[in-house]
């Protein structure tokens, strides 16, 4: 939300209101001039969604049902998940057709990946049989770091073609962009980070990482 240049004080309805069934997804959408995306924004209310969802019937399907109403409006819907495996993440996995997993090439990230893959398998078995892992994206990569290279090699060895060829480097301009409320493409399109994300977009659209 912040990265899209949206002022949180101007949000009337957020994705939280959608998840608890108070408004439709369409009622929350704001157009981001900074990123050219339509965004269903989030604010501090989302922190309470986990508790509020507990008492809702078929709570795992709230986001899926909301997105379903807008299927004919958008070609792509991107769901930005929290870094924790909770009910919000489960809602995202139930709603999604594919999962893109961004991952730092560090030991603890590798350990967490195992937990996430296990969760995706359980969701696929019990709640969303069509979900697939679209790909793994190596991010904040520092080629000078020996451990990063080792983890990268291990990912490629274990997941093969599921690992994107594109690698997102550790880049100062990428780190600066969110504080300016801009996507990397609009903050500094010539930066190594922005060019890497453009290459990733092309790879995803062409599906070349699975070749």
Regions found by a protein language model. Give the residues of each.
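P-loop NTP-binding core
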Residues: 1-211
């Amino acid at each position: 939300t912040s990265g899209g240049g949206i002022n949180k004080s101007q949000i009337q309805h957020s994705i939280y209101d959608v998840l608890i069934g108070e408004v439709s997804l369409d009622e929350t959408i704001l157009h981001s001039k900074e990123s050219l995306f339509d965004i269903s924004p989030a604010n501090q209310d989302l922190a309470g969604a986990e508790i509020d969802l507990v008492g809702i019937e078929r709570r795992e399907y709230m986001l899926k049902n909301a997105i379903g109403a807008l299927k004919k409006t958008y070609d792509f819907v991107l769901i930005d998940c929290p870094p924790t495996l909770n009910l919000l993440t489960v809602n995202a996995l139930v709603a999604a057709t594919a999962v893109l997993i961004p991952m730092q090439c560090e030991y603890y990230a590798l350990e967490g990946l195992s937990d996430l893959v296990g969760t995706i398998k359980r969701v696929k078995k019990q709640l969303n049989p069509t979900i697939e892992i679209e790909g793994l994206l190596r991010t904040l990569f520092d080629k000078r770091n020996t451990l990063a290279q080792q983890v990268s090699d291990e990912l490629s060895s274990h997941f093969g073609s599921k690992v994107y060829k594109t690698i997102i480097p550790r880049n100062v301009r990428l780190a600066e962009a969110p504080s300016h409320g801009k996507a990397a493409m609009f903050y500094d399109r010539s930066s190594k980070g922005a060019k890497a994300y453009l290459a990733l977009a092309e790879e995803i659209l062409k599906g070349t990482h699975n070749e």
